[in-house]
């Protein structure tokens, strides 16, 4: 049997990290077992589902490198098939037409409230002669659900869960306008797509009993179900915007790497030893559902920042430099010349060691593209005393005698410090302030080599007032 799983988002908004983790678990499960990962867009909410929202979800999955093995299936294109299955159930006596009016249903709800019981349709049209149907009423089609016994689900994460059939009512399969309900459409689509494992959030667990009854009524084999716990905020409440970023593309825009976000989400609810950082190939090799816990996970943004910093330091300099250039132009409004882009690339080993996100990385590279005189932090300004400016003027003369390589510049600073009987830091920090406007940067000899003699001279002269 070939394992086939699916991720089935509704395009009514952004892809949130809970959905992203569900997609990741499906993807890794399929890859681990040599199976196939599919995508179904559940766009049956015709008012809220938009092409723009669909594109946002597809872009987010593409950014996370969770690409489906087949073209996406759009649920809205399958209404005829959903109706066909409902008609088959009618013909087999597994479903029936219900002509209840809105007023009758409202009275049932009111009675349930008075009795302090959950609302359930009372089945009044279950065995009634359709000849008694009122004129001008378009019926819904309801499942003829079993009333005796239990429906049992053997969940691969939650274990065995069961419900008494008397607690379930005859759910609607087709609305009066002929459109399918969500629960019916999902079952038909999963069956037709050959889905073997349904891996989704445990907020869908109660739906599974009703969906299992549809499978049974059609004589179809049920897929395996695995309901994974939800992600909560640090306070244990349902994750929301007040906790921080929740949209996948918001994390992208804030400068998180996709592989870092996936790594963090994987470890949020799945465990395998003490390893915190796992490349994708190791994730595929190790992942299986037996490592998924039942308890809700808590989002830890500080931990995610740490994980992102680890991946940032390991990322290729060329890739990071290209992203920084794009962010400087898009987010900070600085046109970046080819020369400046080259300087950023040269400095990337030192820049990325201090950054936790791509946004921070771009901030730290601003000094490269700014023109002299540079804006100064208070700490940097305080370093540029009269004595420090004298040192800068003298250092320029020594630098002019070098080939402006990093090693030669370092030796020139070291020799000057020894000659003046000063610590190297007392020389390097004012120089850093003059060249970057800050007290934090990559090694200052690397900064000078990247900027080049003309730019270094221009920046020091601007501090000296020349």
Curated annotation (Swiss-Prot):
BP GO terms, sorted: glutamyl-tRNA aminoacylation
Protein EC: 6.1.1.17
Main localization of the protein described in the UniProt heading: cytoplasm
Keywords of the record: Aminoacyl-tRNA synthetase, ATP-binding, Cytoplasm, Ligase, Nucleotide-binding, Protein biosynthesis
Motif ('KMSKS' region): 238-242
Catalyzed chemical reaction(s): tRNA(Glu) + L-glutamate + ATP = L-glutamyl-tRNA(Glu) + AMP + diphosphate
Alphabetized GO MF terms: ATP binding; glutamate-tRNA ligase activity; tRNA binding; zinc ion binding
Motif annotated as 'HIGH' region, chain positions: 9-19
Domain of life: Bacteria
Similarity remark: Belongs to the class-I aminoacyl-tRNA synthetase family. Glutamate--tRNA ligase type 1 subfamily.
Subunit structure: Monomer.
This protein's name: Glutamate--tRNA ligase 1
Gene (UniProt): gltX1
């Amino acid at each position: 049997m070939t394992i086939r799983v699916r991720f089935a988002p509704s395009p009514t908004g952004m892809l949130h990290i809970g959905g992203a983790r569900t997609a990741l678990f499906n993807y890794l499960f399929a890859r681990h077992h040599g199976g196939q990962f599919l995508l179904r867009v559940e766009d049956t909410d015709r008012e809220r589902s938009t092409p723009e929202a669909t594109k946002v979800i597809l872009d987010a999955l593409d950014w996370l490198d969770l690409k489906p093995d087949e073209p996406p299936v759009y649920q809205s294109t399958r209404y005829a098939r959903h109706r066909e299955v409902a008609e088959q159930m009618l013909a087999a006596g597994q479903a029936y037409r219900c002509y209840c009016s809105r007023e009758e249903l409202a009275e049932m709800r009111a009675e349930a409230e008075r009795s302090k019981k959950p609302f359930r349709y009372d089945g009044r049209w279950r065995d009634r002669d359709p000849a008694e149907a009122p004129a001008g009423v378009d019926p819904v089609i309801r499942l003829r659900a079993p009333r005796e016994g239990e429906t049992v689900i053997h969940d691969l994460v939650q274990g065995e869960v069961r419900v008494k059939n008397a607690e379930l009512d005859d759910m609607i399969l087709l609305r009066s306008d002929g459109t399918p309900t969500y629960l019916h459409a999902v079952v038909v689509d999963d069956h037709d797509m050959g889905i073997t494992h349904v891996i989704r959030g445990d907020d869908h667990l109660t739906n599974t009993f009703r969906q299992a009854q549809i499978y049974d009524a059609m004589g179809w084999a049920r897929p395996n179900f695995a309901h994974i716990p939800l992600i909560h905020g640090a306070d244990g409440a349902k994750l929301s915007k007040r906790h921080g970023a929740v949209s996948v593309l918001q994390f992208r825009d804030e400068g998180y790497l996709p592989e870092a976000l996936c790594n963090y989400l994987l470890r949020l609810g799945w465990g395998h030893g003490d390893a915190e950082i796992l490349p994708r190939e190791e994730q595929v090799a190790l992942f299986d559902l037996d490592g998924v816990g039942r308890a809700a996970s808590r989002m830890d943004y500080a931990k995610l920042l740490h994980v992102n910093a680890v991946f940032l330091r390991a990322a290729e300099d060329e890739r990071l430099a290209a992203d920084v250039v794009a962010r400087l132009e898009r987010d900070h409004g600085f046109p970046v010349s080819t020369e400046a882009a080259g300087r950023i690339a040269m400095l990337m080993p030192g820049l990325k060691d201090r950054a936790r996100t791509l946004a921070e990385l771009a901030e730290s590279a601003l000094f490269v593209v700014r023109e002299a005189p540079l804006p100064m932090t208070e700490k940097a300004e305080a370093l540029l005393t009269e004595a420090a400016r004298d040192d800068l003027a003298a250092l320029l003369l020594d630098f002019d005698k070098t080939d402006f390589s990093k090693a030669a510049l370092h030796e020139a600073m070291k020799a000057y410090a020894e000659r003046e009987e000063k610590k190297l830091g007392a020389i390097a920090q004012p120089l850093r302030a003059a060249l970057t406007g800050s007290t934090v940067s990559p090694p200052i000899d690397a900064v000078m080599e990247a900027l080049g003699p003309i730019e270094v001279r221009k920046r020091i002269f601007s501090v000296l007032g020349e």
